[in-house]
From Swiss-Prot:
The lineage of its organism: Bacteria, Pseudomonadati, Pseudomonadota, Betaproteobacteria, Rhodocyclales. Heteromultimer composed of HisG and HisZ subunits. Keywords: Amino-acid biosynthesis, ATP-binding, Cytoplasm, Glycosyltransferase, Histidine biosynthesis, Nucleotide-binding, Transferase. InterPro entries: ATP_PRibTrfase_cat (IPR013820), ATP_PRibTrfase_CS (IPR018198), ATP_PRibTrfase_HisG (IPR001348), ATP_PRibTrfase_HisG_short (IPR024893). GO terms for molecular function: ATP binding; ATP phosphoribosyltransferase activity. It comes from Aromatoleum aromaticum (strain DSM 19018 / LMG 30748 / EbN1). Lacks the C-terminal regulatory region which is replaced by HisZ. The keyword Nucleotide-binding applies. This is ATP phosphoribosyltransferase. GO terms for cellular component: cytoplasm.
Length: 213
């Protein structure tokens, strides 16, 4: 029997995906927040979930280890989207990709055309594209966490990171100075899977689309 595999990450994306799965008649057999299982069965024998790191979701789908996945726009921009069909913005896990600096830093002057800014981020591609469009020379420093520390210790002038409420920035005496883009999570589909398993995937796409409206 043909089956489909959906790649999800733990945390906010998984929790906000549950109502969409329910709309498609899919109920996970385990909760990844409390279970150590990385492959989770569902109430449907033809659907299973695999639990992966958020940044790995597009790779699993690109290479066909998963037929579908749910990933943030931020992750997809860094991945590049090769081999992926992105049929639907699910409007979940919403936040924004922003530039932030320590309070008092003259970002307006530093980011004028021809200026130079040292930026710490894990979103290298998005940051590079943003500053290139502004005509600003940018020295990018790749970090994987604790972005807020970089301006405080002189590692960088600014950071590019995801912001939701802004409370972490405020707690570290930083401020949001520019929004790069709004971020939400999208449904992604392996292009070959869509052709070979359309009879299974298409109803799922339609159920998700109906739930998002």
């Amino acid at each position: 029997m043909s089956s489909i595999t959906l790649a999800l990450s733990k945390g906010r994306i998984f929790e906000e995906t549950l109502p969409l799965l329910a709309a498609a008649g899919i109920v996970p057999a385990d909760n990844p927040e409390t279970s150590r299982k990385l492959i989770i069965d569902t109430n449907r024998p033809d659907v299973r979930l695999v639990i992966v790191r958020a940044t790995d979701t597009p790779t699993y789908v690109q290479y066909g280890a998963a037929d579908l996945g749910i990933a943030g726009k931020d992750v997809l921009l860094e991945h590049g989207g090769a081999g992926l069909y992105q049929p639907l913005d699910l409007d979940i896990a919403k936040c924004r990709l922003c530039v932030a600096t320590r309070k008092g830093f003259d970002y307006a002057a530093a980011s004028r055309p021809g200026g130079r800014v040292r930026v710490a981020t894990k979103y290298i591609n998005s940051a590079k594209t943003h500053f290139a469009a502004k005509g600003v020379h940018v020295d990018l420093i790749k970090l994987y966490g604790s972005m807020e520390l970089a301006p405080l210790v002189g590692l960088a002038d600014a950071i590019v990171d995801l912001v939701s409420s802004g409370s972490t920035l405020r707690a570290n005496n930083l401020e949001e100075v520019e929004e790069i883009m709004p971020i939400s999570s999208r449904l992604i589909v392996n292009q070959a899977s869509l052709k070979l398993k359309r009879e299974l995937i298409q109803p799922l796409l339609e159920a998700f689309a109906g739930a998002v409206k």
